[in-house]
Amino acid sequence: EPAKSEDLIKWRQSAYQVLHWNMDRLKANIDSPQYNKDDGIKAANTIAAIANSGMGSLFAAGTETGKGWHPTSVKPAFFTDGKKVGEVAVAFNKEANELAKVAATGDAAAVKAQFGKVGQTCKACHDDFRRKD
């Protein structure tokens, strides 16, 4: 039996919360006086794992409206502009995978620079496909 729209929306909302948590904890680590390599690796690897998890399947037809934990904030354009969605998804995956590689080096300045690149891919998707309400 296929998953219900409500479940798909809940799962993607949950995944984005885990992503947000790891972006926040990595930023706090980068901004701290003493960068912790192990914590950076944990956060970066989690971000990369989410990027590579196949979340696109959670945006099935019928989930452009509705409620998971809260009403979905995805714009209808996400479901009609496949080319642009593909571009932002590929960019996010690429930069998230690079973040995991850079985090493994323990170079705080390099992690900070790559973190910024990941953040830009998040912003690109939010600007085009996330409602502000």
Curated annotation (Swiss-Prot):
UniProt GO cellular component terms: periplasmic space
Record-linked InterPro entries: Cyt_c/b562, Cyt_c_II, Cyt_c_prime, Cyt_c_prime_subgr
Record-linked Gene3D superfamilies: Cytochrome c/b562
An annotated GO BP: electron transport chain
Keywords from the named record: Electron transport, Heme, Iron, Metal-binding, Transport
Any one GO MF annotation of this record: heme binding
PROSITE patterns listed in its UniProt record: CYTCII
Domain of life: Bacteria
Entry PTM: Binds 1 heme c group covalently per subunit.
The keyword Iron is assigned to this record: yes
Sequence positions that bind heme c: R12, T72, C122, C125, H126
SUPFAM superfamilies registered for this protein in UniProt: Cytochromes
Function: Cytochrome c' is the most widely occurring bacterial c-type cytochrome. Cytochromes c' are high-spin proteins and the heme has no sixth ligand. Their exact function is not known.
Name of the protein: Cytochrome c'
Provenance organism: Rhodocyclus tenuis
